[in-house]
Amino acid sequence: MKGKIPLAKLRKNRLFKVLSLALTLVILTGIFAGCGKEPEEETTTTTPPTTQAPTTEPYVTRSINPLTGEGNYPEELLKNRPVMISVENHKDARPQWGITDADIVWEMEAEGGITRMLLMFADASRIPEQVGPTRSARHYFVELVEGFDAIFVHFGGSPQAYNALDNHGTDHIDGMSDSGTFARDTSRNVSSEHRAYTTGEKVMKAIENKDFRTTLEDEYVNPFKFNTSPTKLEDGTCNQMVVAFSSYATYTYTYSEEDNLYYSSLNGNRFNDSDGNQQNFTNLIICYADKSSLGDKKGRISLDLSEGNGVYVSNGTYQEITWEKGDYSDMMKFYDADGKELSLNTGRTYIGIVASSRESECTIS
C-alpha cells in the first residue's frame, strides 16, 4: 500500500540501527580507555554488546462472530465450519422459518424470476429449531458454498447442481437421500415441496453421522473485516434501497435511525418470518452479476460469479464497490473504490446477487 513500509524492510532498518549504535559504543569505549591512566597489573575483559531480535506481539484471537463481528462469541466455535441452508421464496413458502436467525442471508434468482435464499450460520449450533422451507440446490449455490468451506443443506437439486456437488466433493446434506434430517410441516395447506424444513439438532446429528470434517481448513481466512465502531460510508445518503430481482421479487429496504437497521418489504408488504418478525439487517451488499440461460425446459439460469460491481449500504449511507470470486472454490471478496477490502459495520448482513440487466432498477434514495 502506498506510503507504508513493508514489514521486512522495517525490521531490517531497525536491526541496522542497533548494530551501528553498538559499534559506535565499542569504538568510544576504546578511545576513552586509551586516554586514561592504565592500571597496574589489571586486565579488563570487554563483553561484546548483544542485540535483541525484533519481536512481534502475539496474535490474539478476538471472540467475535466471524460473520457478524458481534462479541461474546464462544471461543471454542471460532474454528468451526459454517453451514449454508437453501430456503425457497415462492409465495407458498412464506413466511419462512428461521430467516431472521441467520448470520448472513444470501439471495439470488433460481428461475422464472423466483428467488432462493442461502441462510448462512457461523456454526451448526446456531441453527434454530426450525429452518425452511428447504429447497433444491443450483450449481452457483454450490460455488458460493465451496468458497466458504461450508457444509451445505438442501432438498434436491438441478442436474448441474448435482454435477457440481460430485465434482468438488462438497460436504452436503440432501433431503432426497437424508430424509431423517428433514420433516414436513402439517400446519400449512400448501403442496409438500413448500413444507419441508430442518432443525439445528437434526443438522448437527447428520454432520456427525456422515463424519464430516467440522473444523475449517488450516488456510481458511475469515471472510469479513469489521469496523471497531459504526461508520458512515462516503458516497452519499441511503434511507431506502430498492433491490429488483424481478417483477416477482422486488424488495424495499428502509432505514431506521432508531436502531440503524434496514427493514425489508417484499413487493410492498412487510417481509416477516414465521414469528412475525420483520427481516432486518445492519449491512446490505448488492452484487450485480451477468445472467445467462441454460436453455433447458425448466428455464434454469446461470450466474457468473467471477467478478463484478455493486453497492454497500449501511448506517444510512452507501458506497459503490467491486467484488470478485475468481476460481470456483475461492471465497467471494468485496472491495471499496480504492481496491481495499471492504470493512463492515457490526451486525447481520444481506447479500443479494442481482442480474446485471436489472441494475438500473435497483435504486437508492
Regions found by a protein language model. Name each.
Residues L21-L28:
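Hydrophobic alpha-helical membrane-embedded or membrane-associated segments
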Residues Q52-W106, E111-S365:
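A surface/extracellular/periplasmic glyco- and lipid-processing/surface-interacting theme
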Residues R14, E41-T43, L284, K291:
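Short linear motifs in intrinsically disordered/low-complexity regions
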Residues G36-E38:
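Bacterial signal peptide processing site
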Residues G30-G34:
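C-terminal motif of bacterial Sec signal peptides marking the signal peptidase cleavage site
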Residues I5, K9-L21:
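Bacterial N-terminal signal peptides that target proteins for export
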Residues E42-T56:
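Low-complexity, acidic Ser/Thr/Pro-rich repeat tracts that form intrinsically disordered stalk/linker regions
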